[in-house]
Each structure stands twice: as C-alpha cells, then as structure tokens.
A protein has these predicted regions:
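Single conserved hydrophobic/aromatic residue that forms the stacking wall/gate
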Residues: 1-13
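PLP-dependent aminotransferase class I/II
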Residues: 25-196
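Glycine-rich phosphate-binding loop of ATP-grasp-fold ATP-dependent ligases
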Residues: 17-22
Length: 196
C-alpha cells in the first residue's frame, strides 16, 4: 500500500517519470488497468471490456525512431522470409498463402489459411507450434463481435458475418521478423509440410 493513499487521494493516481506509472489501491483495480492497457484482454482469447494499446513508453517510441534508420534492411529481411514461406508452403495441400496486388509489401505479418484439406485444424497446428516453442498467432481470433460488449449488437450476429468467423477459425500468422534464424524458418515450413 502506497503511503500517499492516506492523503485522501482518489481511486487511482499517476506518477510522472520515464514511462510513468499508475498507482492503484488494490489488486482488482490494478487488474482492470492491466486489461484496459492491453485491448481489454485477460488472456490470449478472452476480452472483458474495450481497451487500448497502452503499452508504449517514451523510451519505446525513441527506440522506434532509431529503428527507422534501418527500415530498408528490416523490410528486406521480412520480405526474404515471406518469400521463403510462400515458395515452400504454396504447394502444401490445405494451406493457402495470401497474395497481394501491391508491388511491394512490408511483410509485417505472414498469415496463412488452414483449409479443410489440411490434416490438422488451425488450433491443432497452433498447439503443435506451441509445443515446439515457436510463437505463432491466431490473429483476429476470437472475432471482436464475439466479445461481451459487442455480441448483443445486431451487427455482431455470426450469421451475418460468415467471412469473419471463417477467417477467425482458419488464420494463423507465422513468425516473421528481422533476426529470425533461418533454421527456425525452416522448422516452421517443415512443421507445416510434415504435420499429420
């Protein structure tokens, strides 16, 4: 318990220093702040209320500006990994790699669709990668329209959003970042190609 609470402050107060801090009187309030700063998520798939991406500090922003000096190399490395994935995964039955009409793509993500012809469903493939300590993401899962704060809206009815729910059940994003070791990229490809 912070000694300043005895001064009759409100429910929370902030401290101003590099990165800042929010001080709360109890674990429940802290937990709510943690949810709010992380898009409302309590775990990988559960959202309890609307939130924001409130995780960037000034130091992170400064590092981001420094990284802009190397953006061409970063994008080239991402594109190289994306090309490798595409080259080796387009022939795997039941895996669909997205294509883009853009002449140049930043390769910020590499989503694939796990289709009916593949021996595993998306969640089983995700679990397989997790067991191998390879971080993949089930992006757009669960759909935002399934969150409690939106699910009662008429526009959130799953019957009216077949593409949303289909994509949410099939998309998995593969790791793609500068410095990703080639052997990990190869393991990702081998894992997908040899799954049964």
């Amino acid at each position: 318990r912070d000694p300043l609470w005895s001064r009759g402050l409100g429910d929370v107060y902030k401290r101003q220093f590099e990165g800042g801090a929010i001080v709360s009187p109890d674990a429940e309030t802290k937990q709510r702040i943690d949810h709010l700063k992380n898009f409302g998520f309590v775990d990988e798939t559960t959202v309890v209320e609307p939130g924001i991406n409130g995780k960037m500090s000034e130091i992170n922003a400064a590092f981001g500006l420094l990284q802009l000096k190397h953006i061409d190399e970063v994008l080239a490395e991402r594109r190289r990994i994306a090309a490798f994935y595409r080259q080796h995964l387009t022939q795997v039955c039941g895996i669909t790699c997205l294509t883009s009409s853009a002449k140049r793509h930043n390769a910020s993500y590499f989503p694939i669709f796990v289709e009916a012809g593949y021996p595993l469903d998306r969640d089983a493939l995700y679990a397989l990668f997790k067991r191998k300590n390879i971080h993949t993401r089930r992006y757009f899962y669960p759909p935002i329209t399934s969150f409690p704060m939106y699910s009662a809206l008429q526009s959130a009815c799953p019957a009216g959003l077949p593409n949303t729910y289909s994509a949410a059940d099939r998309v998995i994003c593969l790791p793609i970042y500068p410095g990703l070791p080639d052997e990990v990229v190869q393991t990702v490809v081998d894992t997908i190609a040899n799954a049964s």
